[in-house]
């Protein structure tokens, strides 16, 4: 078995999700993409106890940010796509003017091919499509406001720690109504982590 099989599967799902969202959403900015990925992961986790991409999110000012991905694609004020993504995704610079007259530089993802949805389970495909439909015409600002709604992962984390910048704990997103208990989800995540660690040795 390939030592990196677990990471490769997560990486492939991340790429295909980004290709899909950039195709289906009108404003696939960097911050919007972060929001969409977070929605995909947290919604799937709430139903199954496992995220789709296995990204770790932190609670930043404007919403949840996948820290590892952000650090990988951000170089100063530029957005640089990794080699394994650049054949499938492009990125265009755009500039918008706010109501106050402030000019803001944005990056818009652009798909170069059709997404391969075969890497996702039927449940993952359903959630992927639901998230894209919800935010199809939303702006990054509207998506950011949605992140701040009561009960959302970002809001729970800020309330828990009283500050921005902390890691959003997937387990904290589960409620009594969730199909999976916190204990079950914790055990599944620990098993998945142990599996990856064993094959990385």
Give each language-model segment a name.
Residues 1-201:
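Domain-edge interaction signal
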């Amino acid at each position: 078995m390939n030592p990196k099989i677990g990471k490769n599967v997560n990486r492939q799902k991340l790429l295909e999700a980004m290709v899909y969202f950039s195709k289906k959403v009108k404003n696939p900015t960097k911050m919007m993409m972060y929001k969409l990925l977070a929605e995909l992961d947290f919604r799937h986790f709430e139903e199954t106890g496992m995220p789709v991409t296995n990204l770790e999110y932190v609670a930043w000012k404007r919403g949840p940010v996948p820290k590892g991905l952000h650090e990988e694609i951000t170089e100063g004020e530029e957005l640089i796509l990794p080699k394994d993504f650049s054949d499938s995704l492009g990125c265009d610079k755009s500039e918008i003017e706010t109501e106050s007259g402030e000019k803001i530089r944005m990056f818009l993802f652009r798909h170069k091919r059709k997404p391969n949805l075969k890497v996702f389970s039927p449940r993952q495909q359903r959630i992927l499509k639901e998230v894209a439909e919800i935010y199809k015409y939303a702006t990054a600002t509207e998506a950011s406001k949605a992140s701040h709604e009561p009960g959302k992962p970002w809001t729970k984390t800020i309330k828990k720690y009283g500050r921005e910048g902390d890691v959003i704990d997937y387990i904290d997103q589960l409620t009594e109504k969730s199909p999976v208990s916190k204990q079950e989800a914790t055990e599944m995540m620990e098993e998945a982590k142990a599996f990856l660690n064993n094959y990385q040795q």
